[in-house]
Amino acid sequence: MAANLWLILGLLASHSSDLAAVREAPPTAVTTPIQNLHIDPAHYTLSWDPAPGADITTGAFCRKGRDIFVWADPGLARCSFQSLSLCHVTNFTVFLGKDRAVAGSIQFPPDDDGDHEAAAQDLRCWVHEGQLSCQWERGPKATGDVHYRMFWRDVRLGPAHNRECPHYHSLDVNTAGPAPHGGHEGCTLDLDTVLGSTPNSPDLVPQVTITVNGSGRAGPVPCMDNTVDLQRAEVLAPPTLTVECNGSEAHARWVARNRFHHGLLGYTLQVNQSSRSEPQEYNVSIPHFWVPNAGAISFRVKSRSEVYPRKLSSWSEAWGLVCPPEVMPVKTALVTSVATVLGAGLVAAGLLLWWRKSLLYRLCPPIPRLRLPLAGEMVVWEPALEDCEVTPVTDA
């Protein structure tokens, strides 16, 4: 009995020591193939360092928020983006391998615990006839003293290049320059002034970053920003149409009024001609059109984007005109008449000669030539011996 008791106590002591060893064992370190993940807002890059001994030769790619995946720069431990928001907290993730294993993630910019519901909301922008216009709504928790200011810059440049929009407006007040109250709910920027008036120039800015800042007596409120692709945001304007008659022909030509679709437009032309019961539509790629023998006719035209096929302009103003019928000059008419008469005379003479020859042929048919065959009909005469007596004659 005593021996059994000592055996039980020994087993319990051994189990307790094993549990203590388990509790005292250091936790297993979780290792990742990358470390020191960080954002460079000046160059729009997400960089990292490979962990010691990590094999990341299988390829890396990144993702900003819910955007499409971006491959890492060749030979470098970083991904480059076209833009980075300095206002929205965005999650950046690095993936490795074909199975898209998550290697690390980071948020940028760090959340400053500001009241984001006081920031401007629903920022939207569009381009029309050389002007960039943006509108926003006041934050639902913005106090009455909060006012907003809009800045813009080339997306390829950093925040140090921000420039303020000069022409603010609100729902009920239009004013140039900063308004003295918090009524800013939009702003318009003349792109021809700040970018130059030459479309498709080498210095053409393809995208801009729009930032709306807010501030009140309690201090600044979080900002709102957005990257605007100027070509995508451009609202197509109807072309400027002119028409004229060139004799009996009608000539229509037009000029597009879109800055960021230079050379990337097609056109739909509608022609309403009095000689036709229904208007005719033509899809053309060149900015002019000819109609022969036009008569009473009218034109209108609209643009369509070759980049975004669903993007169309409205119809231009319809222009009508009446072109005179085609009139042949007197000299040309005389020459044509003479040529017609001569041609008819030659045809008649030819027919007469043919008729006379045909009649003579029927009245006096030609006598066929006789061909006397020689072979088989000839008689060959051969000399024969004389059978008469010949008496010689002598002189007396």
UniProtKB/Swiss-Prot annotation:
Topology Extracellular: residue spans: 17-331
GO cellular component terms attached to this protein's record: endomembrane system; membrane; plasma membrane
A GO MF label: cytokine receptor activity
Covalent cross-link Glycyl lysine isopeptide (Lys-Gly) (interchain with G-Cter in ubiquitin) as placed by the record, residue numbers: 357
Sugar-modified residues: 91, 213, 246, 272, 283
Keyword Transmembrane belongs to the record: yes
GO biological process: cytokine-mediated signaling pathway; interleukin-3-mediated signaling pathway; monocyte differentiation; regulation of cell growth
Post-translational modification: Ubiquitinated at Lys-357 by RNFT2 in response to IL3. Ubiquitination leads ligand-induced degradation by the proteasome. Ubiquitinated by RNF128 via 'Lys-27'-linked polyubiquitination, facilitating its degradation through the lysosomal pathway.
InterPro entries: FN3_sf, Ig-like_fold, Short_hematopoietin_rcpt_2_CS, TypeI_recpt_CBD
Signal sequence, renumbered to the chain: 1-16
Positions occupied by motif Box 1 motif: 363-371
Segments carrying motif WSXWS motif: 312-316
Keyword terms, alphabetized: Cell membrane, Disulfide bond, Glycoprotein, Isopeptide bond, Membrane, Receptor, Signal, Transmembrane, Transmembrane helix, Ubl conjugation
Disulfide-linked positions: 62-79, 87-223, 125-134, 165-187, 245-323
Transmembrane segments annotated in the record for this chain: 332-355
Superkingdom of this protein's organism: Eukaryota
Job of this protein: Cell surface receptor for IL3 expressed on hematopoietic progenitor cells, monocytes and B-lymphocytes that controls the production and differentiation of hematopoietic progenitor cells into lineage-restricted cells. Ligand stimulation rapidly induces hetrodimerization with IL3RB, phosphorylation and enzyme activity of effector proteins such as JAK2 and PI3K that play a role in signaling cell proliferation and differentiation. Activation of JAK2 leads to STAT5-mediated transcriptional program.
UniProt record similarity statement: Belongs to the type I cytokine receptor family. Type 5 subfamily.
UniProt comment concerning the protein's domains: The WSXWS motif appears to be necessary for proper protein folding and thereby efficient intracellular transport and cell-surface receptor binding.
Descriptive protein name: Interleukin-3 receptor subunit alpha
Organism: Mus musculus (Mouse)
